[in-house]
Structure formats: C-alpha cells, structure tokens
Amino acid sequence: MSEFQIDKIGLKVGLEIHQQLAVKKKLFCNCPSVESEEYPIQFFRKLRVSKSELGEFDPTAIFERSKSKTIVYNANPESSCLVEQDEEPPHEVNENAKNVVLTIAFALKSIIFNEIHVMRKLVIDGSNTSGFQRTMLVSQGGYLDVDGKRIGVQSVSLEEDAAKILGETADTREYALDRLGIPLIEIALEPVSGKPEEVRKIALALGRLLRATKKVERGLGTIRQDVNVSIQGGNVVEIKGVQKLDQLEKIIEYEARRQHGLVIISSKLNNMTLDRIAKEGDVKNVTEIFRNCKSTVIQKALKEGAVVKAIRIKNFSGMFGFEPYQGIRLGKQIGELVRFFGLGGVFHSDELPNYGIEEIEIKEIKKTLELEQNDAFLVLAGEMKKVEPAIESIIKRIEDAKVGVPAETRMATSDGETIYLRPRPGASRMYPETDIPPIIVTETELVDAQKMIPKSWEETISELENTYDLNPQLAVQVFDSNYSDLFEIICQDKNLSPNFVASVLCSTITNLERQGLDSKLLKSSEILRAFNLLSNGEIAKESIEIIFSNIMSGKTHSIDEIIKNASISKMDLIELESVLDDLIEANINIVHEQRERSIGPLMGIAMKTMRGKADGQIINQILEKKIREKLD
C-alpha cells in the first residue's frame, strides 16, 4: 500500500452551509417550524421522472427512478398543511426569512439582486412531496475573512428544508413533513486549497457569523454542511450531510484518500488492455448454479424469487481487490453502488471463495462465462427489475474507473467515511417556479437589513465576558453551544451564578452525552424549570445533573417524578445539621484519628447519601464547623 500525503495531491474543498432560520413560520405557509411527535395523517406517493423544458432527463432523477420505491408521508396538522402535501399552491414568501438572509448577505459583502426569482430544484428521492425543492438566489460574490485569509463567497440563497426521513426498506421510504418547508439559508463558498483543519476553521467562522445574528436555529439537524472535494486529475465529488464540525476533518481526509486511491487504480487500469463490457455477451443468468449454495445472502434472495446474474470483466483479475490505501478498493465502491438499488450486495472474484460461495460454484461460473485466466467476474442477486438497472450502473462504474474519480454525490457516515448516494445532478435539474411571481427587494428592506448586521466575533465574546463575568474560554463555549440564547434567559435570574449556568450547559450536558445519553430528549422548557427550582431553593445544585441524566436516558420526562423517585427535594438547614451530627457520631473514630483531615472522607460519605438534597458547599462548611467543635 502507498503512503498517503494529503498536501501533495492538489486537494480543493468547497463548502456549502445549510442553516435553518429561527423565524417561527415556514417559508411558503403559516405553519409553525416545530417538531411533531405524532403523525395522525399518512399518505403514499410514487414519484415519476419527467423531462425538463429542454426535453432532457436529469441523471439523478433517472437513478432514483431505477430504485422504484413507494414514498410514505406522515403529517401532523400542527406542523404542516396542504402546501406541504402539494395539494395547495405556495403562499407568499416568509418576509422575516427573506430579511434575515438579506442581513447575512450584507455581512458577507455579497451583491444582492434587486429582483429574486424562485426556482424549482428537482428532488426525486421523496424528501419533497412535489418532486422539487423551492430555492431562490438572493446574492452573489462577497467574502469571509478567516485567520488572515479572504475566502470567496459564490452565492447566498434562501430555500425550503426537506422532509425528515423516518426509515427505509427495500421497497419503501418513509418521511415526516414537520421539517419540510422550514426556511434555510444556503451559503456556497469558493473552493480553497489547504489542509482539512483549515477548512474546519472556515466552517467554524461562518457558523459563528450565522449564530451572531441570533436568527438561526441551533442543535443537531439544524445545520448541514455539504462538502465539494476534488484532487488534481479528478472530478468534483459532493459529500452530503456533514452535521458536526468534528466530522469535517475526518471526512475530507478520507475522501481525499479515497479519490487519490481511485486515481492510482485508474493509472494501473490504463496500462492494461481492457475490453468494454458487453451486456449481451458478458452478462449471464446463473440462478441454477446457486440453488444449493451456502451463501445466506443469495439463499435469502432466492427464497424471495430473485435471479442471480454474473458479469464477466476481461483481463480484470486482481483489480477489484487491489488496495492502494487501506479500505480503498474498487470492489468496495461497486458494493456501495449496488446497495442503493436495494440489493444485498455484490460478490467479486478477488474475494472468492468466501461468504458461502465455494469452489464448486466458482468453477461453474467460470465455465458459463467462458472465463480465461486473467478474467474477473461479479455476482449479484435480486429482483429482475432491480438487478437489470444495477448491472447497467456497474458496467458504467467500471468504465469510469479507467478515468479515475467519477463525479458523484456521496453521503457522510458517522465514522468519518463516505458512501455512494447518487450521480451528480445535471443542468436540467433547475427550472422556474410558476406559482410565485418575482420578489422585489426594496430600498427600505436593504437599509433595514444593513442595520441588523451582527457584531464581530471578537465584540460578541467580549460582551459575554463583561456582561456575565465569564473567562474567555467559557464565553467561547457558551457562544458555540446550542444553548447560548437559553443561557441569557436563565441568567436574567440574579439568584443564579452565570458561571455555574455556563458550566452546566457547556460541560455537564456534554459529559452526559459522552456517556451515551441523548441531549435531544432534554427540552429547553425542562432546563429552564430545573434552574427555576434551584433559584427558588427547592433543589440543590447537584440535583441538576441527576435531573438531566434521568431525562436524557429516556427514563422519564417529568421533573416532579425525578425529584420524588430520586429523593432530591432540598433539605432544610435543621434537617441537614441533624443528619451531619449523626454522620459524625457514626464515624467518630475517623474524626479522632485524622482530625482536620477527616473532612475529606466524611464529605465523601455525606455526598453519597445527600447528593442532590443539599448544596455541596454548604455541607462542607457545616462539616468543617462541627468537626472543629468536636476536636475543641
């Protein structure tokens, strides 16, 4: 395997940031931008591909059509209406959303158009009931300064968010409509050359600018970063769905390594004599050969009435398993492609015998395909209507391997890799929206938007430090967290220490997440109530973590129930002193032996029984006082 050097491959990365706007209503109707928990309405759609005005088909639409999926939509009248169901024309554009985008365009020194045209962007994966997403270009050009470098802005757009996917089977894909239509800002930056950590800094700086407006949503799922990655000699690959900054560097590094590995593979292929695969002569039905095979994947498919097909690739032996870098193989790329047709997978000759496919089947395949010594083969099983388009895509992908890096769209995974999603869209993907007239941007709107440009990053952090007496590190943590607005609301209560509130929101919740607990279960209303109870003296500081832990674990959503079950209602001072008197008497030997140093072990014993029932600092003070009295 080769040694990968990321700074020697001509890496270029372009960022597209998609951020939900906090404007309460959806983009083209009056439905609130809220998340539903129940969906009493359900309906089904089968989206079909159609030609553009120029009579052309978009490649992504053709690809999605080949999967032949039924789309199931779930809706709640509290968060969606007939507009989301595509049973009613869109209403006028959300003026608040438009004004926020104008402000951000000004902040980026972008040139705003005086007339905005709504367009339809073809989307046929089912995430839009209409088969398209409404989007409008608001401005072009501009820049963002990051660490002394000026990063160009390509465009700023306002668009509607897609439906939320709930699940997928081989034949269906299921969505919820509560997210569909929520206003999004899309900012596309110019591609930059540099290391992944530099790209992360750019994304962080842009995210901070957006958050400084206080008009964008926060939390997982409210911001998504699409990353366009290319290397010297390769096409641009779009990576969708990067939700966390921590993922960004790993994904860029993996994708750069994957692409360079494909370039190495193509270089090797171009030094070989290869024939183009002929579907008529090189593809055979080998179902009967596998009737009694031990492969669980193939046997499962056969029980469902599948066919098994084999493809001959002349002079290709060893190329599916060739690994220029660890984990980068052409066989793996083709496996990703096949899975998106709803097939269990594909087997290639470089990995066989294995997976229940034995020498007896391999021998029969070689005979049926008339293989020569240096030939390779692929085997796949599934319904005929899925296998046929999958074979066409495999043949094209093998041809693309000779070129190097094919232009495609991939999806980011949680472990920092990418998997195949679909082909790159073509120019015929976008066409005008006929239900909405052009939107005029008035001079008054421009003046008002310019007045709303947020303070700089440095000014914002300085203001947090001075207003709440935070150190610089904690001020940055508060601003970058999902709870900065909530922090300011909680700190209006003068009984609460801003430093303690910041520590809970930025450290306690993060630590609970690291233990595998789910912060999405912790609502802002519950956080506010917990701090109100603390301010009123009904619970101790230590109770906050106990309450959050119970909610984030999914055990209960009721704070009253947690207080009752965990026995964390606050002790009064008389009861506390009585309990500590009993504790000292029960451990009087420790007090006499260790004297003043006995505070440590006694404090540990006290906190085991009184954690959440009394403030730790008060327990410590009373213990110290009572130990001194005993020793005197």
Please annotate each region the language model reported.
Residues 519-528, 541-609:
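Strongly charged, low-complexity linkers/loops
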